[in-house]
A protein has these predicted regions:
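Beta/alpha (TIM)-barrel catalytic core signal, keyed to glycine-rich beta->alpha loops juxtaposed to Asp/Glu
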Residues: 1-120
Length: 120
């Protein structure tokens, strides 16, 4: 959502691409900020992570389409294992319908940062 809703980091990604610099992505499975202190099974996450497998797969595919060589999944063991499972299952390239879905979803959430932030 940070890139799709707030254009966060696109300048850095472009500069890295132009200079052949590898990028490690953080928070690619972040959904939004918590609205309450009830974090259920995600006690280790300061943000609400994606939990739907298909949504996570699209988020990972989108992330890896942005000149990113790797990413760090959330600190939740189940989500960490799911991310590894997904990347080990021959991820296909993200398609236009999936990008549209992610853009539509990003309109309705409170992302974990904004385009003005320097540190998240």
């Amino acid at each position: 959502a940070l890139i799709l809703k707030n254009n966060f980091g696109t300048e850095v990604l472009k500069k890295c691409n132009d200079n052949n610099v590898s990028v490690l992505a953080l928070k690619c499975m972040a959904y939004e900020l918590w609205e309450s202190d009830d974090r259920g099974e995600f006690q280790k996450c300061w943000y609400k992570p994606l939990s739907d497998k298909d949504f996570i797969e699209m988020a990972i595919k989108f992330t890896l389409s942005q000149n990113v060589v790797s990413f760090l999944p959330p600190g939740n063991e189940r989500l960490f294992k799911l991310a590894i499972e997904l990347v080990n299952n021959d991820l296909k390239k993200i398609n236009d319908d999936e990008i549209k879905f992610l853009k539509d979803q990003s309109k309705h959430i409170n992302p974990i940062g904004s385009s003005e932030e320097v540190h998240i």
